[in-house]
């Protein structure tokens, strides 16, 4: 089947991507060891699924409807592996500072509302009540639009995956002196028996989160991107309460 050839090609690209992510821009042997150990767990589930469904497709006399269903599973699991590799490569580049940065003046409130708004369908599906609070007057920051979008995107994906359904998610934009802070606060679906420092480490997630399809790279990438934009990201954990604060220097209105 042509589709199987495509998935075989996907697996080859995945292997190449893993090798590149591990060997390129990563000087810490400890980091490489942790990366291999933890990512192998995330790769195992979709890879096992792909192998099993390929085996089923190789059997004779498979009804077309079943074959279609198997191919859909293969496509979905291949997409998971592709996303993992993309995140690995971005994490490597972000942590090494090799990503290009184009700082420009952005209106934080408008940018925040627009980006968070892209998650309307996901938050409604997870029965999350978004509460966004921001000043009426514009607040400007210096940031890279593409990287800033990715930071918010990663945080919102994290919220959609791990927040307790039927709870409120608070997002607050405020200016404090020469600083601008954006705070994300939500209730986790399980107790966070881990320190905020450990949460910022790549691939460290609570055992309960292994039931989701995340790869644990989102927070690490967001933190590295904030540093590249001369900003700061802080995490706070208290039981099942999870809070992230993004901090930028305030940009003068000209």
Across the structure, where does each feature detected by a protein language model lie?
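Conserved catalytic submotifs in the C-terminal HATPase_c
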Residues: 102-106, 129-139
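Short conserved segment of the HATPase_c
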Residues: 191-204
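Short alpha-helical segment of the dimerization/phosphotransfer core of two-component systems
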Residues: 76-81
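Short beta-strand/loop element within the Bergerat-fold HATPase_c
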Residues: 166-178
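Short helix-loop "hinge" at the ATP-lid/N-box region of the Bergerat-fold HATPase_c
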Residues: 159-160
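Conserved micro-motifs of the catalytic ATP-binding
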Residues: 96-101, 140-143
């Amino acid at each position: 089947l042509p589709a199987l050839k495509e998935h075989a090609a996907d697996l080859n690209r995945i292997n190449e991507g893993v090798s590149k992510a591990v060997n390129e821009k990563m000087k810490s042997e400890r980091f490489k060891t942790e990366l291999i150990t933890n990512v192998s767990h995330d790769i195992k589930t979709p890879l096992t699924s792909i192998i099993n469904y390929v085996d089923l497709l190789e059997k004779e006399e498979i009804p077309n409807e079943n074959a279609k269903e198997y191919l859909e599973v293969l496509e979905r699991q291949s997409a998971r592996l592709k996303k993992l590799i993309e995140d690995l490569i971005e994490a490597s580049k972000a942590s090494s500072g090799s990503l290009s940065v184009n700082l420009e003046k952005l209106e934080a409130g408008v940018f925040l509302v627009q980006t968070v708004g892209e998650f309307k369908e996901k938050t409604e599906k997870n029965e999350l009540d978004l509460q966004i609070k921001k000043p009426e007057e514009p607040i400007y920051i210096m940031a890279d639009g593409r990287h800033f979008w990715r930071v918010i995107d990663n945080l919102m994906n994290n919220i959609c995956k791990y927040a307790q359904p039927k709870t409120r998610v608070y997002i607050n934009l405020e200016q404090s002196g020469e600083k601008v802070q954006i705070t994300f606060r939500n209730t986790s679906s399980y107790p966070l028996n881990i320190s905020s420092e450990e949460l910022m480490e790549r691939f460290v997630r609570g055992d309960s989160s292994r039931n989701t399809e995340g790869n644990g790279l989102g927070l690490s990438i967001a933190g590295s991107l904030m540093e590249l934009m001369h900003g700061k990201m802080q995490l706070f954990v208290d039981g099942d309460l999870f809070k992230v604060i993004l901090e930028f220097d305030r940009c003068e209105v000209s």
